[in-house]
Amino acid sequence: TDIAVLLFSGEEYQAELEWFHYFKEKHTPTLCVLSKADTLTDSDSIAAQLKEETKQEILVISSKSKEDIEKFKEELIRLVPDDYGEETITGALVEEGDLVLLVMPQDIQAPKGRLILPQVQTIRDLLDHKCLVMSCTTDKLEDTLAALARPPKLIITDSQVFRTVYDKKPQESLLTSFSVLFAEYKGDFAYYKESAAAISSLTEESKVLIAECCTHAPLKEDIGREKIPNMLRKRIGAGLTVDIVSGTDFPKDLSNYDLIIQCGACMFNKKYVMTRIERAKEQKVPMSNYGVAIAYLSGILDKISY
């Protein structure tokens, strides 16, 4: 949650106060509103009590009043952080006029007739940066590079073909992946990168949790359910335990796991992902993401851009 709105409607508000303290603990900006003021004979007294409890101003409104509704909107806008919405997917990697090449395998996981959400969002972000955007499938990478008058400033690839693209890219072109971009955009890249090193200490007795935000029906060669577990077991051993959760499912107790690998989280906002990361940090469990983990397993983590 980026901003919380707590509605108080009378003298009974202990449940709301519990939520208030929860949001305060999470450093979430909170607007406290005493609503239905037109039905309360002692709204000023209740507001004073709430102010004493919360140590912040209480907005007293009635939804029947247009002026009160406008006051509510103004207070809500006031709580929006100054830098809200300024972060972008490609960040400082590109400038206006840069040539960017997207490598997007159209395998069984790619939905027929459309692109997946991270690709769509990244293309829009690049267009907003006024970049020149080209795209190709993995098998057409060499043909595409040969057709260009100059090397791309940046190549963004699907993480599962990281090594293939790295081996074929021009030396001067920066390389990243959609998942790595979202690691920075939606999460804590520094922690993801640091945690990827935990892969080297895993054994066949270790437990890994893979967390994906999508709730789609898994397909053959699914990156989270098949490809990453297979890559890990190939390196560590067939005995490695890999648990998988999806959607909003995420264990409160993470202490049984030696590593968590989170997807790019294109479906969730940053605050939601950071809540997971904070939980992992509190329980001292390393947490990485799909792209960062694959880059580590491919031996190119120190050679990619983000």
Language-model regions, residue ranges each:
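Short, well-ordered coil/turn residues at beta-beta hairpins
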Residues: 7-9, 103, 158, 263
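Residue-level signal for short, function-critical loop segments
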Residues: 10, 36, 106-107, 214
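Alpha-helix N-cap/loop-to-helix initiation residues
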Residues: 12-13, 39-40, 65, 109-112, ...
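Canonical P-loop GTPase G-domain recognition
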Residues: 28-31, 36-92, 99-101, 108, ...
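Short flexible coil/turn linkers enriched for glycine and charged/polar residues
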Residues: 94-96, 202
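Short beta-strand segments enriched in small/hydrophobic residues
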Residues: 100-106, 207-212
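C-terminal effector/interaction modules appended to NTPase cores
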Residues: 113-117, 122-306
